[in-house]
């Protein structure tokens, strides 16, 4: 089976990819989206979102990374897709699933689900702009406010020449509500298409991954939020390994505070450590206590000192 690390805007950036791929066995990471409007973006934009481009499109530990584009105009998606692969990206991905109001308001992400023809035109333009030996993938949801167009959406992706399709098993309107996950619908799409379909949504552990694959028939999954809840989730999902012990999680957080974010204004670690702890609290009781301690801290040095002060030896 393949396990992919999902793109999560404002969460899974290059530093977190570096940390997570060191302790996991991901087959591929997809970047946060590069927003494409009406121009060919400068090289520095791609390098900011995906610094791994300067390392043969791999994280420091060797996991492949693919640049994701978000936009609606085929010409500019094509030109920026070509630039991404020229810079070294291992293929490109088209975002047709992001539910963010800001993104949808500008005509990108899940908005494309309303009109599968836009998905077809965007993916086709990207496919034609990218050398045939490199993959072009598309990430979608089941629809905007219903699943009525799910087959039309899937057909558009395949007919555009995409290499593979990632399906999040909910509509845009359903957001991330657990009760709405529909792995069966993903399976219906998989049966319809000839290209590989990757299942996404509500995969939190080995059992849920097995259930998802059994219901959908997919042999590959993409995980997002769960990868932050359990930092070694790909190994849990692939090999039924136990979740990472809390002392190892703390060591990961300590390393995170030592990594420098390029062009950081001094608030990067403040926001991101608190954000990560809020995910960890769902799996580790110890994270709640640590979160209560750091949530009142408002600058990176204080956050770093608080995390670094934890004696891992006493946790074992």
Curated annotation (Swiss-Prot):
FMN binds at residues 7-9, 68, 139, 200-202, 224-225. One of its GO terms (molecular function) is flavin adenine dinucleotide binding. InterPro entries: Aldolase_TIM, DUS-like_FMN-bd, DUS_fam, DusC, DusC_C, tRNA_hU_synthase_CS. Disulfide bonds: none annotated. The record marks 35, 95, 176, 272, 274, 279, 295 as: Interacts with tRNA. It catalyses: 5,6-dihydrouridine(16) in tRNA + NADP(+) = uridine(16) in tRNA + NADPH + H(+); 5,6-dihydrouridine(16) in tRNA + NAD(+) = uridine(16) in tRNA + NADH + H(+). Its EC number is 1.3.1.-. The keyword Plastid does not apply. It comes from the Bacteria. Pfam families: Dus. Catalyzes the synthesis of 5,6-dihydrouridine (D), a modified base found in the D-loop of most tRNAs, via the reduction of the C5-C6 double bond in target uridines. Specifically modifies U16 in tRNAs. NCBIfam families: PRK10550.1. Belongs to the Dus family. DusC subfamily. This is tRNA-dihydrouridine(16) synthase. The lineage of its organism: Bacteria, Pseudomonadati, Pseudomonadota, Gammaproteobacteria, Enterobacterales. The gene is dusC.
């Amino acid at each position: 089976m393949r396990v992919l690390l999902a793109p999560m805007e404002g969460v899974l950036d290059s530093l977190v990819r570096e940390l997570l791929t060191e302790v996991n066995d991901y087959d591929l990471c997809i970047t946060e989206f590069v927003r494409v409007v009406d121009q060919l973006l400068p090289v520095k934009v791609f390098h900011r979102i995906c610094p791994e481009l300067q390392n043969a499109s791999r994280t420091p530990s060797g996991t492949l990374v693919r640049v994701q584009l978000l936009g609606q105009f085929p010409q500019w998606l094509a030109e920026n897709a070509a630039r991404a692969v020229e810079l070294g990206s291992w293929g490109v991905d088209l975002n047709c699933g992001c539910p963010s109001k800001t993104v949808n308001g500008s005509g990108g992400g899940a908005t494309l689900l309303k009109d599968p023809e836009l998905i077809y035109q965007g993916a086709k333009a990207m496919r034609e702009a990218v050398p045939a030996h490199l993959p072009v993938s598309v990430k979608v949801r089941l629809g905007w406010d219903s699943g009525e167009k799910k087959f039309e959406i899937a057909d558009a992706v395949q007919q555009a020449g995409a290499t593979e399709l990632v399906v999040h098993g909910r509509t845009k309107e359903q957001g991330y509500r657990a009760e709405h996950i529909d792995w069966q619908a993903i399976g219906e799409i998989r049966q319809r298409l000839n290209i590989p379909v990757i299942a996404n949504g509500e995969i939190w552990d080995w059992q849920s991954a097995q259930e998802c694959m059994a219901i959908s028939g997919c042999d590959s999954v993409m995980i997002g939020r769960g990868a932050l809840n359990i930092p070694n989730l790909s190994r849990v999902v692939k090999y039924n390994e136990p979740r990472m012990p809390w002392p190892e999680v703390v060591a990961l957080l300590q390393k995170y505070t030592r990594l420098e974010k390029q062009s950081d204004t001094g608030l990067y670690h403040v926001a991101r450590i608190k954000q990560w702890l809020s995910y960890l609290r769902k799996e580790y009781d110890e994270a709640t206590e640590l979160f209560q301690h750091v949530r009142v801290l408002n600058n990176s040095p204080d956050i770093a000192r608080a995390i670094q002060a934890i004696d891992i030896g006493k946790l074992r």
